């Protein structure tokens, strides 16, 4: 049994519910995982996080931080689902800008750019421009 072997080696088993095939994305699926000995779940779905918490599982809610509107909805979702941890993605946006800027299509960096340093960092990583609603940064 993979779960028992992992536990014997001091590892915790967290199931990514958004990617796991063959397991219902509902209360029954969560109960099944808890019965199998899984330690917790990862999911973008607040309802899955709530079900898992009710089943006594450890929870990580995953968020994609794309823009300031999305950040606002993250706070609301966290308040409703109360995960044990959150994962905010992407974690390495500078690296992604650099990778794509080496191609033939120009890259514009946008979303969550709030400071002059963030503008210059995006340009330094290879973006040709920055898209922001922050008027103070329009003339940087």
Predicted regions and their residues:
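Short beta-strand/loop segments at the ligand-binding rim of alpha/beta enzyme cores
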Residues: 6-18, 37, 55-64, 101-110
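Structural motif
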Residues: 36, 55, 80-81, 125
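Glycine-rich phosphate-binding active-site loops on the catalytic face of alpha/beta enzymes
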Residues: 47-48, 90-96, 111-140
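Generic structural signal for hydrophobic
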Residues: 6, 33, 52, 77-78, ...
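Generic hydrophobic/aromatic pocket-lining and core-packing "Φ" positions
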Residues: 3, 30, 49, 74-75, ...
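Short, small-residue-enriched loops and turns at beta-alpha junctions
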Residues: 19-24, 65-69, 94-95, 115-116, ...
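Catalytic beta/alpha-barrel core
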Residues: 1, 14-21, 36-49, 60-68, ...
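Strongly charged, low-complexity linkers/loops
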Residues: 73-101
